[in-house]
Regions:
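Sec-dependent signal peptide recognition
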Residues: 2-9
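Residue-level marker of regulatory loop/turn positions in helix-turn-helix DNA-binding domains and
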Residues: 7, 43, 159, 163
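C-terminal motif of bacterial Sec signal peptides marking the signal peptidase cleavage site
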Residues: 14-17
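Propeptide-to-catalytic entry region of secreted or membrane-anchored zinc metalloproteases
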Residues: 19-129
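Sec-exported extracytoplasmic/periplasmic mature domains
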Residues: 74-82, 176-183, 238-244
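Active-site-proximal segment of zinc-dependent metalloprotease catalytic domains
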Residues: 114-188
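The catalytic-center signature of Zn2+-dependent metalloproteases
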Residues: 157-232
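Short, low-complexity, Pro/Ser/Thr/Gly-rich segments in the mature regions of secreted, periplasmic
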Residues: 226-244
C-alpha cells in the first residue's frame, strides 16, 4: 500500500509538468508557417539564431547560398549572431510527400529552440515533391523548410544558373518563415499577388511567386532576385516594431 502511495504521488508530481509541455507543444508557433515571425525577427525571446541543415548525400547546399541566407537574416532581424551546422544522410527515395518530409525532419533534426537560440531547420532533398513536381522549395512549419536540390538543378537555363536559383529559393523560403507576404498580417502596401497568395506581385522581389517554381526560367528575365524589395522590408520592419 505504501508503494502504491509513492507511485500515485509521483504521478501527481509529474502530471503538471507533462500537461505544461503538452500545452507548449499545442500552442507553439512552430505548428504554422509564418507564426514564428516575431521570434525570428526580434531578439526579445531569442537573441541568437542557428540554422541546422540536413541534406541527402551528394545534394549538399551551395556554400554561397548558405552565406547569402545568413546575410539576409542578419539584415532583417535583430539577432546578435547567426550560426550554421550541416549534416548529410542517405536516402534512396525520388519523391517525397509532406508526411515523409516531416518524418525525415523528425529523424534527422537535432536541435530545437531553447535558451536564447531560435533554430531554423532546412532539409535538402533529391527528387521531387510528391504533391507538385514543379516545386523547388517549400516552407512547411513555423521553423522549417525544404529545398529540392535536384529540381533546382533541372530548372537551370541558359541564362540562369542552378546556383543563382538556389540563392533565390533559400531566401524565398526564409521569407515565408517570417510571414511574407500577408501571411497572418495585413500589409500597408499593395504588394501581394492576387493569383498567388502570400507572394509578391513584384518580379524584382525574392518573394515573387515564380521563385519557388520550376517554371522560373520562363517567368523571369535574367538572374532571379535574391533580396527583398522595399515593401517586403518595410513589412518586416513594422513586424519587429510591433506595428503589424
Amino acid at each position: 500500500m505504501k508503494g502504491l502511495k509513492v507511485i500515485l504521488a509521483a504521478v501527481l508530481v509529474l502530471m503538471p509538468g507533462c500537461l505544461e509541455n503538452l500545452k507548449e507543444e499545442l500552442v507553439s508557433c512552430e505548428n504554422v508557417t509564418g507564426e514564428c515571425r516575431y521570434e525570428i525577427l526580434r531578439s526579445t525571446d531569442y537573441s541568437r539564431l542557428h540554422i541546422e541543415i540536413n541534406y541527402v548525400t551528394e545534394f549538399a547546399p551551395d556554400s554561397e547560398a548558405v552565406d547569402l541566407l545568413k546575410q539576409r537574416i542578419q539584415e532583417t532581424t535583430d539577432k546578435t549572431s547567426v550560426s550554421v551546422s550541416q549534416n548529410g544522410f542517405g536516402s534512396t527515395d525520388s519523391s517525397y510527400s509532406l508526411e515523409e518530409i516531416l518524418a525525415i525532419e523528425k529523424e534527422q533534426r537535432e536541435r530545437h529552440k531553447s535558451g536564447n537560440t531560435f533554430i531554423i531547420h532546412i532539409l535538402y532533398l533529391n527528387g521531387e515533391y510528391e504533391d507538385n513536381d514543379q516545386t523547388l522549395g517549400l516552407a512547411y512549419t513555423g521553423s522549417s523548410f525544404v529545398l529540392f536540390k535536384e529540381q533546382i538543378s533541372d530548372a537551370a537555363f541558359f541564362l540562369i544558373s542552378a546556383e543563382d536559383i538556389e540563392k533565390s529559393v533559400i531566401v524565398h523560403e526564409y521569407g515565408h518563415l517570417v510571414a511574407l507576404v500577408n501571411n497572418g498580417y495585413e500589409s500597408p502596401h499593395d504588394h501581394e499577388d492576387p493569383d498567388h497568395p502570400n507572394h509578391s506581385n513584384n518580379e524584382d522581389s525574392v518573394m515573387y511567386w515564380a521563385i519557388e517554381s520550376q517554371d522560373i526560367a520562363n517567368q523571369i528575365d535574367g538572374e532571379p532576385p535574391n533580396n527583398f524589395d522595399s515593401n517586403d522590408l518595410d513589412d518586416l520592419k513594422l513586424m519587429k516594431e510591433g506595428k503589424l
